[in-house]
Amino acid sequence: MKKTIILALVLAFVLTGLGLGQAQKPSDIKFPSLTYNPPDPAAFKTPFANGLRGYVQEDRTLPLINISAHINFGGLYLSKDKQGLDTLMSGTLIQGGTKTKEGPAIQERLDFLGGSLSFNVAERTSTLTLSVLSKDLDEGLTLFFDVLMNPEFREGPLNLAKARVLQQLRQANDQPSGVLSREYEKVLYGDHPLTWQPTKATYDGITGADLKAVHAKYFFPKNIILSAAGDFAKADLKAKIDKFVAPWKNKDLALPAFSKAFHSPEPGVYFIQMPTNQGYIDIGHLGLEDTNPDYYAVQIMNFILGGGSFSSRITSKVRSTEGLSYNQGSRFTYRWGFPGVFSGYVQTKSSTVGYAISLIQDEFNRIRKEPVGDAELETAIAYYLESFANSFESAQGTMSSFANLEMTGKPMTYYKTYRDKIRAVTKAKVQEVANKYVHPDKAVIMIVGDWDPSNKGGDKWPGPLDKLGKVHKLSLADPLTGEIGK
């Protein structure tokens, strides 16, 4: 009897699986088209008192509120002798307390509320972010604006921050990947605020008065954009924030102007000796700004070349076919107001350093000379179209994105037109931008690794490395002093 029941169940399962019209393979499955319209920044733009700008969205999903202040100040705005002040400000704006509260007291109160307050300084923007339960909004805003408007940068917390960053500075040359990133940009950008590095002397010379002076110069309502999302009534939040910022004084500020006249480094191999059994490699040159009209076609081109994980050409050749690496590809980085960097990259054992580089260079030349395939183009475009909605997964993330658009001067129609510009990319356009922005003959090949086995090569690509171009052996600076070793 039991066997009969089991047989009947199995037969029913099989017959169900053979139902008419069922897809026989995944590619046969048809999904309804996804229709998604991105939110319009204008619907969330909120002017506050005293020229403070903002983007605000009510989100009643959870009893939480997130608020960020995006300040037009970053490490690039510092003089050469004040390098590191941005890092110290990151570590002391909150911890250094305010005129009326010690840093530990602020943190203890946030812990009691189950909230958080964080601050970060990047190249050209700084961000102070508050997260609290909606029932604690009033106290959270009081702490948030007290820190934003009245930081004290007390000596004790400042000295602790200096001790932490000096320990990190001592370790700056320990990791090959960190050395590669830093030294590669130095070669590409030259002597420029983008590549200036702090030393022990610059850290030691920074005082609480210096931090207060920078705060006074850059932190005022018209130089800040707020983003906020959470469980609140928009009109109520606006009224509360207006009370905090109404007495805050504005000022005239001329932001620093930066040169875009970068030097042209000599193409070739730039080698940094480190006792490691792998070579850490970047191959490339300066790229473009993300305000360039070619940005969209470059994104598609790079996805095909090396940015598309396992579907990309570099990964397929270097990893899947040759088995040389688990970390390889290509990238275009972007920075506000400057050309970013184009790089092919790979980590591979010392004996295959030259071979891996030659394979990546082959792919650089191939994408310039040959039109990409129909399937490659379709896959790349589909990736950007299908992942587009991910940019708006969280309400606070969306508001912050809108604040960033305004801060960097991008058109507020950026998201509205994004997919149409991606769809418009053609095979001919991909080849055009490949020839315009990928230049193997101008590439800097930066290698961090062990010279002897890397230079010797292996069976498929015997050395020496000067077959790839003129070799420049670089010495690292002592991170504490900035002095170049011999």
Language-model-detected regions and their locations in the chain:
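Acidic/histidine-enriched segments that form metal/cofactor-coordinating
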Residues: 23-26, 30-31, 105-214, 257-260, ...
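Short acidic/His-enriched helical or mixed secondary-structure segments at domain edges of catalytic enzymes
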Residues: 164-182, 260, 264-279, 316-325, ...
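Histidine-acidic residue clusters that define the catalytic metal-binding segment
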Residues: 25-45, 185-224, 252, 256-261, ...
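M16/MPP (pitrilysin/insulinase) zinc-metallopeptidase core fold and M16-derived inactive scaffolds
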Residues: 68-131, 174, 193-197, 308-324, ...
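Buried hydrophobic packing residues in well-ordered domains
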Residues: 51, 69, 85-89, 110, ...
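M16/insulysin-pitrilysin zinc metalloprotease superfamily fold
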Residues: 95-101, 130-162, 308-309, 329, ...
